[in-house]
Amino acid sequence: KGVLNGQDLAGWEATYEAPLTYHYAGLEIGKCGPWSQGPVQLQTLALLNEMGVADWNPVSTDFVHRVTEALKLAFADREAYYGDPDFVKVPLKQLLSREYNRERSKEISDRASLELRPGKISGFEVRMPEFDSSGRGDERFSAMGIGEPTVSKKGETRGDTCHVDVVDRWGNMVSATP
């Protein structure tokens, strides 16, 4: 017994949307919108660009540290600001702006941060989920079964999504995030 049934699939229609893009190192990088995690990669590139990543040794510990810290900041902003733009206002212009990422990049030091540090964007409220730093976990999810981590043995879900890309030998491709 799965989570989807025939009616779910019969009523579904594919949609098309323009990708969210960022120009980096002469390339145009395209990702899905803020209903996905796509903008995290774009913001990470924006942060690294502001810090001069092109001049770093890509096999150095400093490179790995700074990329990791940039990812932490971008993921913190994802937690605070992302959502489906059909339902919430998402400050994408600010999150990907040069000015915002220049200021955010100054938060990266030689020491690893253990804090979840979303940035502050004028006119937008930071919306953070509850976070248990003790590592005990949430009892509500102790009944989850093997396989898809968000589905309990009873077929109940907690609302997460999944993503699949399929390319066949003829070059036909589908990319779906339900």
What role is predicted for each listed range?
Residues G2, V53-P178:
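Internal maturation/activation junctions in enzymes
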Residues P39:
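Flexible, polar/acidic helix-loop-strand segments at domain edges
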Residues K1-I29, P34:
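Long, well-ordered, tryptophan-enriched scaffold segments
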